[in-house]
Amino acid sequence: MLKNPFNNNSLINKYQSLINQINTLEDELKTLTDSELRATSFKLKKQYAESKNLESLIPKSFALTREASLRTLGLRHFDVQLIGGLVLNDKKIAEMKTGEGKTLVATLPAYLNALTEKGVHIVTVNDYLANRDQVSMGQIYRFLGLNTGLIQDGMPNFDRRENYKADITYVTNYEVTFDFLRDNMALNLKDVVLRPFNYCIIDEVDSILIDEAQTPLIISNNIQTPIEKYIVAAEITDYLELNTHYKVDEKNKNVILTEDGSKQIEQILSVQDLYDPRDPWIPYIINALKANALYFNNVHYIVQNNRIIIVDEFTGRIMADRRWGDGLHQAIEAKEKLPIRQKTETVAAITYQNFFLLYPKLSGMTGTGKTAETEFEKIYNLSVEQIPTERPTQRKDLPDLIYKDQFSKWNAVAQNCNQIAKIGQPILVGTTTVEKSEMLAQLLSEYKLSYQILNAKPENVRRESEIVAQAGKKGSITIATNMAGRGTDIILGGNINFKIQKKLYDILTLVKNFKRSKKENIFSSSLLSQFEGSSQKFLSVLVSLSNDQKFLKLSDLDILKILRENDCISIPITSYQCSIRYLIDELITYNKKHQEQENQIVKNLGGLYIIGTERNDSRRVDNQLRGRCGRQGDPGTSRFFLSLDDNLLRLFGGSKIQNFMQTQIPDDSPLESEFITKSLDSAQERVEERAYQQRKNLFDYDDVLNKQRNIVYHERRNILESISVQKNIFAYGEQIITELLIELKEDKSCNIEATNLIENLFGRNLVLNYIKTSSLSISNLDLSELKIYLFNEFWLTYQSKITELSIYGEGIIENLERSIILINTDRIWREHLQKMTLLREAVGWRGYGQRNPLYEYKQDAFYMFETREELLRHLVIYDLLRSSIL
């Protein structure tokens, strides 16, 4: 019976029968050879092909995956990890604590669902994690006869398509979403890279589906931008005073111009009305004020290579490809006196909320999902299950220490670091911004303490994995902006893999570069110290590498890449890769005992000591930081240092907190107040509820556009995949004629000449057999006869165009027709997106008239979509009948 350290009886009882079946199969599979295991895997795939029933395959597929993992990686899935895999397969979110092996757990449902041959996507938050997991976990899948794919930034279309064809593909949320948008802009089927969606497992699911839910993924084109207005608006802000000319709403990230402010600006600009629709200044002024009052360098963005780079508030990482919309990004560029880049218009867009709902089967993993369970259930229909830990948690979460102001708090943090550092206990300090991480670094320098800093600055980002991996070493101090999505585990005593990587990199580059110098023997006395304690075989392998011409041609960067990506570990191909594989194994064996000693020393010191320097808006982010210590039953401690003027309390703490701040409290003494602790918890809950309502509101509005998008993309894909679109052309033309005749029937006063009517309809003059007199009025004709006549004339005109174009070669006509429909579909959709954006802004004002903005939005959006379809028909027929190859 499975032990229950988490007291989650209902979950264990639900899956106990399956766990027992999997464990029973384990002994049977252990007796099989590698080839017999692979043959069993092929039998499972055949069973599914015949029965189309995955449920019956769960026990054997999970047992197979467990055995394959043990044979390839030396890692055996614990029973609690089997539960995690079963939860994921049931289309749920598995909440697993840090270090409990989420990456390994995902292999269980991934292998099972890959048996359908419909593809599985494992989505991670960055390229590094996607590459790392594909290389390591891919060994399990390949052992069982499956292939894996990997999508990385900058990969060409051909490679993307091939990797998406794999049984299991590792990809970032960013890449797969943009591939979806690009696929739905393709003019040729060979440019489409994705196949139909099947099953998706999202790692750090709360980061993607909640924290980034409000950020749409956009493909855009540059449009003309009044750069001088941004520059002038930025200069005007120097002449405006806070609370006199404008007010700042920090909660809603907005600024409000006062009447005095409007007059002051109108006087400076010598204009009568800032809101004049013919020459509006107000959006530029508001954005300039926002840029000055609400967005700060080294907090919300950094300046790099004369560009504004956004910093993700949840992960602390830079988002080089993201830009703020509605002119805000240009306003910040003007504020920082940087070159102002062009504004853009949206060509295609989708939110993560709607994108991931396209998967028929969706699940996710996170260390912190339970606090957001309501949102997961209501928007994504995903429940959250807390997976028991393999070992009881030993982490101690100490009470918050609350200081009067920022100055006192940061001094206390530095003093605490100094005290803990004296005993050698490793420390990880979490900060919320680049600016604060660098300020703390200066304070620690005054204590002459050594530290590593990890924030959005490029020089620090490059060393992210190494910094995080070594944060558990004795005596280390690591300062990091938010820890979400930093996939490397913090191992007490340091991460042996990174130690070996660094040592082996030094050895290999020394061997390669020394050989090139040709001055002396590689193992002369001056270099012998580099290999002290190594075995004779280890030294022999180094000698063979020093004579391997392929190895000697590698650059230092090539060697680093091989070691980082572990290419040589997974599938050694060349002789030098086999040699490096041996060296790694040898160094692991040699260093393992020392690593175990270091690990025990740090455990005896109390494990990793976590310091939080501010409560975040979300409890999940705080828990992500705390969760960095106490992994796999290790000891650890966490404590938050707070001040009464932290943003959370200042903006959302309420009037009682404001009054509390006025009392006489010693600057250097922390407060222990149950009232303040409850106020903090209450403030976080209010902010979370507020954020949830904003995301829910966005989802409700975006759902309208999403339904329209699905229709357009479905119709577009049908056109793209059609051998011939002649039926569509006929349908468009006949629908145009039918709509016109309905209009004529309703409007008896119409007096249009037949020749003009046809020319307007089809973009050309026709030979009129039915109507002998060009001056004959439509009103004098029988509409049913006219309908037959116009249908015939349209068909004749179409056939005439086909004959005209057929001389240019086979397939030309089909490609032209398809391209005309696709190009006009994209053009009208692009214009529709702009109109929908304007409509979204406009309906908000209707609420002041006691009208429901969402209802108004739906009604107007429906009408706009109907007119879009009508316009498409007219443009396609007009362009086709007027088209010419030359």
Curated annotation (Swiss-Prot):
It catalyses: ATP + H2O + cellular proteinSide 1 = ADP + phosphate + cellular proteinSide 2. The keyword Phosphoprotein does not apply. This is Protein translocase subunit SecA. One of its GO terms (cellular component) is chloroplast thylakoid membrane. It is found in: Plastid, Chloroplast stroma; Plastid, Chloroplast thylakoid membrane. SUPFAM superfamilies: Helical scaffold and wing domains of SecA, P-loop containing nucleoside triphosphate hydrolases, Pre-protein crosslinking domain of SecA. It comes from the Eukaryota. The keyword Cell cycle does not apply. It comes from Phaeodactylum tricornutum (strain CCAP 1055/1).
